[in-house]
Amino acid sequence: MLLKYIEIANFKTEMGKIVSIKLSYQTFGKTLHTAPIVLVNHALTGDSTVCGKEGWWQDLIGENKCIDTNQYAVLAFNIPGNGFGNDTRDLIENYKDFTARDIAKVFILGLKKLSITSLYAVIGGSVGGGIAWELAVLKPTLIAHLIPIATDWKSTDWLIANCYLQDLILNNSSNPIADARVHAMLCYRTPISFKTKFDRTTNKSLGVFNIESWLIHHGRKLKNRFHLATYKLMNQLLKTIDITRGRGSFDEVVSQIESHIHVIGVNSDLFFTVGENKDTYLKLKELHLKTTYYEVESIHGHDAFLIEYEQLTRFLTPIFKNQNQQAQSKSTRCASKKAV
């Protein structure tokens, strides 16, 4: 892991707070500016390690994978305050001063520092996808392909309600990270997913149902690697996704986006429902914007974007294969001209 850093001074949040931010990032594959750049936004418990042995999207990104690091320069920022690298000095305690849009603005500043003026694609799941939407609005000509997965351009009332409950747990529980994680797992999965996996079986050695043992495990696992301040911040970002806030109607805001927008929903998602995704897609079509809709079929709910890699690969391959073919074709033409 080689983390690189960008110092951003005097950043003004939507709430009017002035802060200094250390933005960390990793790159994979081709060197920046030598190949098409793909920006990958991580989700609530993720980080910039998107590929490789420890990569959370290693089944999608890597050598000869769907997003081929032999062909693309892959860039991933850490959301400031996510605790990656275990430097507690970079944690953000005043989490309510930040919104998803603030993070998108920080990413834009990071891209500027790296002299990046165009991105072949921005891809992200859940809150990372919400930040991707914000990026597309902030810089309408920046992104060729916008790929928000298991997310939407806004946090719904249902999502806000769950984030509110998460915030209550995080601020009032005696075991906040583990308890909040247990509740969150109920939103990330589905009843049929649990039935298929556990079917009311018991863990005799522990004297509990296997579903309870599984929830306890996930609570402890996150507690051992996550900071409380980080969880509070990420939950706040999830709650504040809204590209229309202070800008006008959805139609007015998205009409300026020049990206091809690939909406990818999950048919069983309880967090960002497929109905909301379809509505978004239909509105984009009505506005005659470049858009495509894909739907992951899964019993696993929201977490399907971290599970159903075969389906995601099938949806994404045409997007990334086309660029590879164009690049190869261009190289061939150049070689032919030189030969002549």
Regions found by a protein language model. Name each.
Residues 26-86:
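N-terminal cap/lid subdomain of alpha/beta-hydrolase-fold enzymes
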Residues 101-120:
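Conserved acidic catalytic loop of the alpha/beta-hydrolase fold
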Residues 270-279:
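Conserved alpha/beta-hydrolase "acid-adjacent" motif
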Residues 279-281, 285-340:
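Catalytic active-site module of serine/aspartate enzymes centered on a nucleophile-bearing elbow/loop
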Residues 118-157:
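Conserved hydrolase catalytic core segment
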Residues 257, 263-265:
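Short beta-strand/loop motif that positions the catalytic acidic residue
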Residues 142-221:
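Alpha/beta-hydrolase-fold enzymes
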Residues 1-37:
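Catalytic-loop region of hydrolases
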